[in-house]
Structure formats: structure tokens, C-alpha cells
Swiss-Prot record:
Contains a large N-terminal NADP-binding domain, and a smaller C-terminal substrate-binding domain. Homopentamer. It comes from the Bacteria. Its cofactor is NADP(+). Binds 1 NADP(+) per subunit. NADP(+) binds at residues 10-11, 31-32, 38, 53, 74-78, 91, 142, 168, 176. GO terms for biological process: ADP-L-glycero-beta-D-manno-heptose biosynthetic process; carbohydrate metabolic process. Pathway: Nucleotide-sugar biosynthesis; ADP-L-glycero-beta-D-manno-heptose biosynthesis; ADP-L-glycero-beta-D-manno-heptose from D-glycero-beta-D-manno-heptose 7-phosphate: step 4/4. The active site is at 138 (proton acceptor), 176 (proton acceptor). GO terms for molecular function: ADP-glyceromanno-heptose 6-epimerase activity; NADP binding. It catalyses: ADP-D-glycero-beta-D-manno-heptose = ADP-L-glycero-beta-D-manno-heptose. It comes from Bordetella petrii (strain ATCC BAA-461 / DSM 12804 / CCUG 43448). InterPro entries: Epimerase_deHydtase, Heptose_epim, NAD(P)-bd_dom_sf. This is ADP-L-glycero-D-manno-heptose-6-epimerase.
Length: 330
């Protein structure tokens, strides 16, 4: 049996599908369906059982779970604007620590979601404490458990892998609202208004030039399954493509894929801007000083751990996402 927490969420539900594609259905899905629409992410998934996150936590603390092959811990509050530190640390740090201790006590492999938010204001994205400067309590809540793992690395009884997700996009993120990817928002904007919006330049960046390491959720699933297949490997690893691309690339990929659907030719960025299909809005004052304008994962350690598969660039991955999303809407 494999536990997937956050199973009705974005990455969690895609992980369940990835396991299903391997013929694995002995899955305990753990989530909080207070926002009931998230169940839609599990409709086409095969699982053995569902547990509410609070009931699951009680069973963890009571030591009453069935024998497990692995725990894939994706459940967390991922809202980077959440200011309630007490809630964030309990939900993201304390629960992760409890699961870690349970898995160590029972020699169960434990893969968990960390985040590139731990780097915050750093300009170097290498898995080293000198580069970790979170800008918000979300990033700190993720860093705190990474620090615990580092102190325990030499005494582990079973595999523990922390994956620092960079900017993930792809199917089944619709419930995330404002925290959904820019690709998701650009798709909705273009279909509703005929154009997309990006932040104008700030902090030395041109309009739409702020750059992130955008990674398809399909590649995130592949990384998780790689470590599931290699239980002898533990550590903290960046989960990105190793390639920074500007938000302009995302917008252009969205608009051109939707244009092609209509039988219209793809256009270069300057023409998209000239025709008003890509527009820029002033950079929000409340984000100044709290915004990562550039991220690019150093994937040296990930590659050294044996993950050799190529990863999608924005042009490929976003186009796949748009086509998938439009097919589901048809």
C-alpha cells in the first residue's frame, strides 16, 4: 500500500495517476475535501481507500496504519501569501515531522514536497544552507523540515527524499485559484478577454521578463517515481528543469496554441504585444521586495542521483497543457 497525501490536489492527483499508469491501485488517498470540488481530481483515479487528513493524522500518531510500501507526502498549505505562521508551521512542518517519525519507526520510504521558496531572496539555487533565505512563512515552513532531515541523514532507517519543487504547471490545478500557474491564468484570460496579462518590468527586468524555472507536472511525477524506484537514495533535491524562462514565453505558448486551435498562425512575441494579445500591467507595490523575479534550479544533484530523463521546456510543456485542458473542456 502507498499513501499519497494531498491526493486530491494538483501534484498529488497527478502522482496517483502516475502510479495508476504503472498498474498500482493499492493507494490510500489522504486529503481535506472541505472544498468539495477537489474530488473532481480523483474521479478518474483508482485508489483503495480515502482518509480525511485529520483522521489520517490521528492514525499516524496512534501507530495504526496498515503496512506501507511508501508515503508520498504532497499535502500542505501552498499559499505563499498566507500570513498565519501558527497554521502554516503546524500544517506544513509539524505534520511532515510526524509522518517522518512514523516512517522512520517502521522503515518506510518517505518522499515529501519541499519548495524552491526556501531560496527566497537568494540568487543561487543549489541545495546548500548558505543559499536558503525564505521571504515568507511558507518558505520557512518548508525549510524547517529540510533542516531536520539534514541533522538525521546519517541515522536514517529508510529512504527520505525532499523535492524542492520550482514553478509547476499542468492539469488538475484549477482548484488553486490565485495560486494556480500563470499558464492556467493566461488560458482563462485569453478565452474570456482575447488577451493575456503579465507584470510589467521591475527590479531591472523588462516587461514580462521576470523568469522562473517552469516545470511540467508530468516531469515532477517522473522525478517522484524515479526516487520511488531507487529506495537506496536519500537527500534533498531541486525539482526543476535547470532552465529559466521568462513569463513572456509562457504567455506566447498559451496564446499561440489557442490561436493554432482556431486555424490562426503562431506569432512572435513582438507581434503578440503589437496586436494587444499580450499586455502588461503595473508591478504590484505589495509584491516589491517579496517576489522572486528569477529562479533556475541547479539540477546537478538530481542528475547525479540517476534521474536522466529530459524535461519539457515551456514551449513544449505549456502547449501540451493547453491542448489537454481544451480537450477536457470540449
Amino acid at each position: 500500500m502507498i499513501v499519497v497525501t494531498g491526493a486530491a490536489g494538483f501534484i498529488g492527483s497527478n502522482l496517483v495517476r502516475g502510479l495508476n499508469r504503472r498498474g498500482i491501485q493499492d493507494i490510500i488517498a489522504v486529503d481535506d475535501l472541505t472544498e468539495g470540488d477537489k474530488f473532481l481530481n480523483l474521479v478518474d483515479c483508482q485508489i483503495a481507500d480515502y482518509l480525511d487528513k485529520d483522521e489520517f493524522r490521528r492514525r499516524v500518531l496512534a501507530g495504526s496504519l496498515p503496512p506501507l510500501r511508501a508515503v508520498l507526502h504532497q499535502g500542505a498549505c501552498s499559499d505563499t501569501t498566507e500570513r498565519n505562521g501558527r497554521y502554516m508551521l503546524d500544517n506544513n512542518y509539524r505534520v511532515t515531522l510526524e509522518l517522518f517519525e512514523y516512517c522512520q519507526a517502521h522503515a518506510i520510504p518517505f518522499l515529501y514536497a519541499s519548495s524552491a521558496a526556501v531560496y527566497g531572496g537568494s540568487s543561487v539555487y543549489v541545495e546548500d544552507p548558505t543559499n536558503e533565505r525564505p521571504l515568507n512563512v511558507y518558505g520557512y515552513s518548508k525549510l524547517l523540515f529540510d533542516q531536520v532531515l539534514r541533522t538525521r541523514m546519517k541515522s536514517l532507517t529508510a529512504q527520505v527524499v525532499g523535492l524542492r519543487y520550482f514553478n509547476v504547471y499542468g492539469p488538475h490545478e484549477q482548484h488553486k485559484g490565485r495560486m494556480a500557474s500563470v499558464a492556467f491564468h493566461n488560458m482563462n484570460q485569453f478565452l474570456a478577454e482575447g488577451h493575456v496579462r503579465l507584470f510589467a518590468g521591475w527590479d531591472g527586468y523588462a516587461d514580462g521578463g521576470q523568469s522562473r524555472d517552469f516545470i511540467s507536472v508530468e516531469d515532477v511525477v517522473a522525478v517522484n517515481l524515479h526516487f520511488l524506484d531507487n529506495p537506496g537514495t536519500s537527500g534533498i533535491f531541486n525539482c526543476g528543469t535547470g532552465r529559466a524562462q521568462p513569463f513572456n514565453d509562457v504567455a506566447a505558448a498559451v496564446v499561440n496554441t489557442l490561436r493554432e486551435e482556431r486555424g490562426e498562425a503562431a506569432l512572435p512575441l513582438d507581434k503578440l504585444v503589437e496586436q494587444g494579445l499580450v499586455r502588461y500591467i503595473p508591478f504590484p507595490d505589495d509584491l516589491k521586495g517579496r517576489y522572486q523575479s528569477y529562479t533556475q534550479a541547479d539540477v546537478t544533484q538530481l542528475r547525479a542521483a540517476g534521474f536522466a530523463a529530459p524535461m519539457r521546456d515551456v514551449q513544449t510543456g505549456v502547449a501540451e497543457y493547453v491542448r489537454y485542458w481544451r480537450a477536457r473542456k470540449a
